Every structure is written in C-alpha cells, then in structure tokens.
Amino acid sequence: MSGPTWLPPKQPEPSRLPQGRSLPRGALGPPTAHGATLQPHPRVNFCPLPPEHCYQPPGVPEDRGPTWVGSHGTPQRLQGLPPDRGIIRPGSLDAEIDSLTSMLADLDGGRSHAPRRPDRQAFEAPPPHAYRGGSLKPSGGAVPTPMLPASHYGGPTPASYATASTPAGPAFPVQVKVAQPVRGCGLPRRGASQASGPLPGPHFPLTGRGEVWGAGYRSHREPGPGVPEGPSGVHIPAGGGRGGGHEPQGPLGQPPEEELERLTKKLVHDMSHPPSGEYFGRCGGCGEDVVGDGAGVVALDRVFHIGCFVCSTCRAQLRGQHFYAVERRAYCESCYVATLEKCSTCSEPILDRILRAMGKAYHPGCFTCVVCHRGLDGIPFTVDATSQIHCIEDFHRKFAPRCSVCGGAIMPEPGQEETVRIVALDRSFHIGCYKCEECGLLLSSEGECQGCYPLDGHILCKACSAWRIQELSATVTTDC
C-alpha cells in the first residue's frame, strides 16, 4: 500500500455529489475518479485522509444517510434529512447548522423518554458509514467532525496514529470539535471541549450492544495503570480489541461477586479481630480454639486444652503423665490397669501378652504344669477332672494304669501318642512284663503257641501250665 501523494494547490473544481445525496457540515466529500486533492481553508489547515484509511463495514450498504460523531466517538445516524439537497453552499451554512441542531435535539429528546434502568441506559448504535476517499471542502468556517473511537474512560481523546504501511506526512494543525450531549439525555449540559492535534488515523468504532449511554459523560480521567497503551502504528479498538465489539457488560450482583464480597468481609473481620496469641487449632475435648503458647497439648493426633486432656474415667489431668490410649480415649495408668483382664492363676492384671486357654486368660509365665511346674507356652497339655493343667508326661504318670508286675504306669512309647497295654485276669501289664510266672517266658497277646495259660490266678505258659496240672492231679490221687 503506497502513501498519499501531496499535490500542489490548484484551482479547485467543485465536486458534485451523486443524485439524492447531501453532504452535512464537516463530512467528507464523495469519492472521485482521480487522486484526492486538498482545498485549503483561509483560516484552517486540513490534513486529508487517504482512501485506505476509510473503513467500510462488511455487509453495510453504501447508500446511507450522513453520520455524525457523538461524545463517545460512536457514529450516529441522522434521520430526516432531505434526500436531495444538492451541494452545500456557504450561503446556506447557518440554516444547515440550525437544521442539524434541531434534529439532534429531537433525537435526544425522544431517547430521554424511553424507559431505562436507574443506574445506566443502553442503546444500540447503528452501523457507521464512511466514504471511500474524496476531497475535503470546508466552507464558511465549517469544521469537520472526525469519527473518534470509543474511549474506555469516557472522555474524548484525539490521538495520532501512523499505520505500518503509510509513512507519516506533514502534520497540519486542526481544530476538532467534539459533539456534546444536549438536554433531554438525563445528564448535565457541558460546553464543547476543544483539542488541537493531527487527525486520527483509521479506526474501527464500536457498534455493539455493550456500549452504555451515559458512560462516556464522566469527568476526564487519566488512563489507569492497568490499561496498556497500544504501540505506535497499532490501533486498539474500544472494547478490548475483540472482533465485532459485541461484549456486553455483566449485570451487577451475580453469585461470583457476592461470594467475593462475602470472603472479603470475612477476611476483614478476621484481620480486625486477630487472636490474642498463637493459634494451634480446635480442642478435641470442648471444641473451642486453642490459642496461646503453653495453652494446649498434642495427643492422639489432636490438640487439647490443658484442662481438657484428662482421664476418661477419673477425670485426672494427664499433662506430663503416662497415659494409655484405648479406642482414641485416654486413660491414666490406674484406670487403664483396672480395665485389663486378670490372670486366672495369680489374679493379677495382664499388662503384657495374654495367653488364653480353655476360655481363661493367663500370664505366659503362669501357665505351667501343676506337677513339674514347667511352662506350657507352645507345648501340648491336658487337664484332669478338676481342671488342673498337666503336661502329657505328668498326666500319664499320675493317671495312667499301673502294671501288675512292676507297678509302673503304662505310658506311650517315646514319639508315640497311643498307649499299648495287655490286660489279663483283670490286670494290666506292660508288653515287656507279660511273662510266664514259672519260667519267665515272654508271652504273646495273640494266644498262639506262646500264649497265656492262666491257672489258679497265675500267668503261665503252655508247658508250665501242663506240668502244674499233672502235679495237682497226683496230689489228689495220693490223698484218696
């Protein structure tokens, strides 16, 4: 894109408007087929706008009525102009000014009767219209009213912009008049403010619903520190630079704002009422705050006041004392011991490991044999009819049957669990004691060749039994 070409002044040729179009005061002329020319005013110097600086909104028909720039920099459509006025001449300038002033008053007066919110009133601005190039032709001291971008802070602020593709040309001082609100807008009337400076570069006015009427009539403010300024050669449109400018402002009093306000009040209250000392948490006994150094103790993964950390049974304070925790409850030593099981042998509380047998609790050292007093922890045992505890050996020695020959207890063999004994003539015998009383022959319990042949209460083998029988028979014969 090439920069504008500045031609020397020539004899001005009257430019003509198309049929049915009128040029209001201060508006740009219609486009021409040749390069843009400049007709200097005897009192005011003008800087022409190059054709590439004019913005044509997409989708907007070209045949629109003239526009004027409000105090927000928002283009407003002027209604009611005659369709065919011809070229504006210096002689009709005063009448044109009066007509425009009357139309503006009617528009603003009609707007003031519309229902609005008590705090702010929103309106929709019609889309702007811009001519594509042309010549500036001020007449009769008329001052053009440029289209200024909507400002974030309400006040009109003319600024100079240099696009990246167009070199900055010579600056011509220009008096720029900013349109001010008239009566009927619900705001105090103010005088027109003036500012000197070069004409602004291309801009894109905000025409969305997010613009609020009356927001731009605040006092002139300096830009806040949180609003960045655009770099030279780059124009940031109003509304944060988002496309289209449709960014409606959120209504007041939404839940996030209420939540933020509540949290802020809570923070202010907490800061206004600080604790008197260091805060350690809530007491596990009474639920109150534990504040101050030395005011609490930590136990059972909780914080307690000194007076709240007591025994669950006798309510004695446990600070600096040994305590026992049972199911997240603290006990002093005496109360804890009272809750323990007692040994069935010595009747003392069991503080260490518990050994249970036959439904009773024992100290491991108290669970012993009543005969040999050997500890039976992990060793097989048995009990008698009176529930006395015996080891297996002592139980057999005490309660096993006795051998009729040796008189010893008949017990299981080492490594065996069963007891083997021989019963004959209602007497019990060890296997090794079951012998013939005459010859000492080891008898067998099977009843075969070396079986027992009892005779007159004696245990005899077969031979000895026969000899005894013959001897008795001879004696009987002799007696006869």
From Swiss-Prot:
Phosphorylation at Tyr-55 by SRC is required for enhancement of lysophosphatidic acid-induced cell migration. Tyr-55 is dephosphorylated by PTPN13. Disulfide bonds: none annotated. It is found in: Cytoplasm, Cytoskeleton; Cell junction, Focal adhesion; Nucleus; Cytoplasm. Residues 108-122 have a biased composition (Basic and acidic residues). Transmembrane segments: none annotated. Residues 473-480 are annotated as: Interaction with MAGI1 and PTPN13. Highly expressed in kidney, stomach, lung, heart and testis. Low expression levels in brain, colon, thymus, pancreas and skin. Not expressed in skeletal muscle. The modification Phosphotyrosine is found at residue 55. Residues 281-339, 341-401, 404-471 form the LIM zinc-binding domain. Pfam families: LIM (PF00412). Residues 1-12 have a biased composition (Pro residues). Residues 238-247 have a biased composition (Gly residues). Residues 1-43, 57-84, 107-134, 218-257 are annotated as: Disordered. GO terms for molecular function: interleukin-1 receptor binding; kinase binding; metal ion binding. Specifically interacts with the ligand binding domain of the thyroid receptor (TR) in the presence of thyroid hormone. Interacts (via the third LIM domain and C-terminus) with PTPN13 (via the second PDZ domain). Interacts (via the second LIM domain or via the third LIM domain plus C-terminus) with PDLIM4 (via PDZ domain). Found in a complex with PTPN13 and PDLIM4. Interacts with SVIL isoform 2. Interacts with LPAR2 but not other LPA receptors. Interacts with PRKAA2. Interacts with MAGI1. Interacts with SCRIB. In case of infection, interacts with S.typhimurium protein sseI. The LIM zinc-binding domains mediate interaction with LPAR2. Belongs to the zyxin/ajuba family. PANTHER family: THYROID RECEPTOR-INTERACTING PROTEIN 6 (PTHR24212:SF7), ZYXIN/TRIP6 (PTHR24212). This is Thyroid receptor-interacting protein 6.
